[in-house]
Structure formats: C-alpha cells, structure tokens
Amino acid sequence: GEVARTGLHGANRLASNSLLEAVVYSGRASRDIIERWKNGDLGEFIGRLPRWRSEDLGLLIENMPLITDLAALRSTMTQDVGLVKSDYRLERAERRVEHIEKEVSRYWKSCKPTQELIELRNLVLVSKLVVDASKSRRNNVGLHFNMDLV
C-alpha cells in the first residue's frame, strides 16, 4: 500500500498499509510483469541488473557494527524525521543517513550478504527516501509538520 503511493486514502494514514492498495496494486504489477515476460519485453531491464558476485566475498564475521548502525538509523529517523520536523533536523538526518549508508556499503561490497545486512541496506534506502520526501515538501499537510513552514 505504501509503495503504491496513490494518495487514495489521504495524508492522515500514518504507517498503515492499506489492504486495498496492497492487493490491487501488487496484483496489477504482477500481471504487468508476467505479460512483459511473455512478450519478451523484460530483456532490456534484465540486462541492466548488476551481475551477482559472491565467489570473492568473505563472510561477515560479526554483526555488532550492523547492530550499531541500525540503532543509529532508528534514533536518527525517530528524533529528526518524526512527527515534528525542521529544516535543520532534516539536513542533520540526511548527513547521518549518508554516513550510515557509506558504512553499510563497505560491508555490502566486501561480505556475502546476510539477512541482517540486506535488511539494514533496505532500511537505509527507505530512510533516504523519507528524508528526501520530507525535505521536498514545502507545506504542512496531514502528519507532515515542519516547524519552519509555519
């Protein structure tokens, strides 16, 4: 539902996943993918996907740095990108998320992925998108409230 970004249920949705959006839009997306696959239209897209390499990657020995990065990401998103925002705090969050992204990228490039590493990498990406969206919104609507826009 959140990924569909339809605005179907307005701005006051909090973090609920709309069953309607989840079912309808995922169904439409899957039918489109299947149809494109049958027609051979996915070749260009598949050709752009990076090749997976794992032969030369080592194992992630310890998860403590990932746990620390996850805690820092959670804290940043809660404190600086929560219900009440400001331009300064969004800039600060952007810098912190970029720093965490660099740390996670080092592990991603040097280690075979673990569930924890994949999840953290995905959370960093979502955090970047949320921060970018919050920075680009120049009016207070629904649950988006920026003190500098009052």
Predicted regions and their residues:
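Glycine- and aromatic-enriched mobile tails/lids
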Residues: 3-150
